[in-house]
Amino acid sequence: MRKALLVTHVSGFVPQFEMNNVHILQNMGYEVHYASNFHNPSYGDDNSRLEGTGIICHQIDFERSPFKRKNITAYRQLKKLMEEHEFDLVHCHTPMGGALARLAAHNTHTGPVIYTAHGFHFFKGAPLINWMIYYPVECYLSRYTDVLICINVEDYKRAK
């Protein structure tokens, strides 16, 4: 059976926004895995909406801030997960989930990798520090991204 991995840094994202994609993948014969920080539910008080969906969940100790050392642990956990499961597809969301998943996928030769950018942190009017940090990181990570999905025109134009 083919395997797909969905990655977000906070749990709750998939049941809130991605269930149609999960159903499509499952109907295409994929076993769907979800890597997230389930200790940090978002878009709801708990992770009960994942029960009965057939999604296989994996705890990854993501932190939202890119400056937290715990994200090194999260990267290692993701890399190990990818090595153990040999995923046929990785679809990542959220800035930290997207960054660490793309690095881990590259270093484990896992792919293709899809990244959905739900609004870059560098945009017209954003603080200069955002441009100094996030823009070069995203430019670097773009080489490890097979498909980039942008949800707004400004991000799409910038990504081209």
Which residues fall in each region the model found?
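Short His-centered aromatic/hydrophobic patch
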Residues: C92-G98, A117
